[in-house]
Amino acid sequence: MTVIRKQDVISSVADALQYISYYHPLDFVQALEKAYHKEESQAAKDAMAQILINSRMSAEGHRPICQDTGIVTCFVNIGMQVQWDSTDMTVQQMVDEGVRQAYTNPDNPLRASVLLDPAGKRINTKDNTPAVVHINMVPGNTVEIQIAAKGGGSENKTKMVMLNPSDDIAEWVEKTLPTMGAGWCPPGMLGIGIGGTAEKAAVLAKESLMEHIDIQELIERGPENAEEELRLDIFNRVNKLGIGAQGLGGLTTVVDVKIKTAPTHAASKPVCLIPNCAATRHVHFTLDGSGPADLTPPKLEEWPDITWEAGANTRRVNLEEVTQADVEQWKTGETVLLSGKILTGRDAAHKRIQGMLESGEGLPEGVDFKGKFISVSYTHLRAHETTV
């Protein structure tokens, strides 16, 4: 009988979330490096170079890979022979306490994005709790935890469909991907859940994104069953769409396709598609009663030695000095290198600011965005003047 301490769960979750905030999984880094060397589109190649360089800088400086540090999803497999040292907290509460400690860590505070009352006032909880926790009781005497932090851009592109049993899943994915735009920040992965019921398909899709990237190994050895054939079919179809890195066109839109299935009703074929962005963040660990998880940092030497030089079609902009006349000279297709102070806000913030200004209401007292830049996903707003 194994005794698991609640503090080991809390500490392990907190450490894991800090860890994945600045360490890309190495399988993703390696897959992206291969895609970089294969890429023929210069714009897409530049985008992948910047992702890889940013990844290394994040690992070196222990700073977040992306400013959207995500909502936490946790899959917890609890062995039937496990005992807890304390029963004053549920597993959900243990995970939430770990999330709270990770996101309020003074050495590397992470952005809190979780809101209460989603259909009403949408009040930020300030510490990114609660997490979404899936608990499964399994044989054994350990606790296995898979934990991820997923940003809103990719999560918002989730697609769900109830297909007819005879419908072609690969064809549906191929038709669906172009409707998702580039807001899910490719290149990434696709997680596909098939079967069960509607909600089961969604959980399967999310859980599949926790798996190791191995599509190249599958290509080399060939598929051994229908599920692997479907993975390869979707992988090839999606990459032939030419969406490419950050939607700039190119050979690689996804570095892997994952599929998990479950038995389903004879009349049904539920399918859920969840993309993972280039800020892929997840880690797995097992608690066996000997203490908290020991997460070994990767070595910086494991990142590729890739550099990126600004090309001729590049404009350098100091945001402290730029004028409206300067902005009007920017051209579609240019690479703009920004320096200076920039504010970040989600689409909802952008919409609210625009609505206040257009209605004549104005901004709240003490809030003045004039002359400042606000980054909103792919849109940059020069407050009170123009959107470019």
Could you say what each language-model-derived stretch is?
Residues 356-377:
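Short peripheral tails and domain-boundary helices/loops at the edges of structured domains
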Residues 177, 323-324, 360-363:
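A generic local structural motif
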Residues 187-193, 338-339, 374-378:
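Short, conserved beta-strand edge motifs with alternating hydrophobic and charged residues
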Residues 37, 56, 60-62, 71, ...:
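Metallocofactor- and cofactor-centric catalytic cores in central/energy metabolism, strongly enriched
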Residues 76, 149, 319, 340, ...:
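Pocket-edge structural micro-motifs
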Residues 380-388:
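Single conserved hydrophobic/aromatic residue that forms the stacking wall/gate
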Residues 1-192, 197-307:
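Non-transmembrane, aqueous-exposed alpha-helical and coiled segments at domain scale
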